[in-house]
Amino acid sequence: MSEVPAKAKVVVIGAGIVGNCLVGHLARLGWTDMVLLDKGPLPNPGGSTGHASNFIFPTDHNKEMAFLTVDSQNQYIAAGLNNTCGGIEVARTPERMEEFKRRMTSAKAWGIDARLVTPAEIKEMVPFINEEILLGGYYTPSVSVVDSLATGTMMRDEAVGKGVLSVFANTEVLDLLTEPAEGGPRIKAVVTDRGTIEAEHVAIACGVWSPRIAAMAGANIPLTPAVHQMADVGPIDILQQSGKELAYPIIRDMDTFCYERQSAGSMEVGSYAHRPIFMHPDEIPSNEEAALSPTELPLTYEDFDPQMEQAIELMDMLGDAEIKYA
């Protein structure tokens, strides 16, 4: 196992989508002498990047967020990593339809192509949906899914190819050494199990592990890891027959805080309606201890079952399939 360099201009801790894109963009801006670290293997070190649903809905009432999302999508399109499938946010209540009308004003203001659709139009786009329980929907043709692992790999490899980045996977950060500076202590070195790196700049991009790493330097990142319930349900005949990864628009069932996203011959069903399930970063299992990955924990059915019933009400075919993994 090779040792890390003794010095670097930039050390980025975490090789998920954020860390990879950071080094890629810094390389495009002319930065050199960078090191990227992750305690897990590549290309999938074990964080959320490797298993998130990765869909992008561009409409936001906040102008900056909407423009940032559209700009990101355009970059993914240019790189050939964007899978456009469209997305429909469906309404079960009159109040939700009123919110969709408000969303239309933001979409129009920011130049995002979107329109309100009737239950019949939703049924035409998604033939297996139960339109009888819907009042309408908000359809955005540009909704897409991005391959976050492929995107991160591309950005990382681009920086490596320019000769400005060294990458060290399976390398754990043990400590951050600080020194007094104007405005408060600054990080002067990163201690790893392969050696210590003196650094001018250190970026923490570890996702759910970030608070733990920041604490090594006496800093507090106000982030609490929360478990999100998601299951892969299948196989489902109509999805298998499509022969595509994404043949149908992604559905966001806004009144039940659920989403349904095709994943080839199966359907990903995710829920945000359950109780808050928090974890301390130290409680997250290691790559060796985890059944799938450190951030893919066993489904707690008592939290997920009520939302699954609502998903089946919207798409009854889900009740005839099995949960492949969760």
What are these regions (language model features)?
Residues 3-18, 35:
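Beta1/beta-strand and adjacent pyrophosphate-binding region of the FAD-binding site
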Residues 18, 42, 209:
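Conserved Rossmann-like nucleotide-cofactor binding loop
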Residues 27-48:
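Glycine-rich FAD pyrophosphate-binding loop
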Residues 52-125, 255-260, 264-268, 278, ...:
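Dinucleotide-binding Rossmann-like beta1-alpha1 core, especially the glycine-rich loop
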Residues 67-68, 89-99, 138-160, 168, ...:
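Short beta-strand to alpha-helix junction loop
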Residues 86, 220, 236-326:
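Active-site lid/adjacent beta-loop-alpha segment flanking the redox-cofactor pocket in flavoenzymes
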Residues 139-201:
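Helical element adjacent to the flavin cofactor pocket in flavoenzyme catalytic cores
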Residues 192-249:
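Central helical "cap/lid" subdomain
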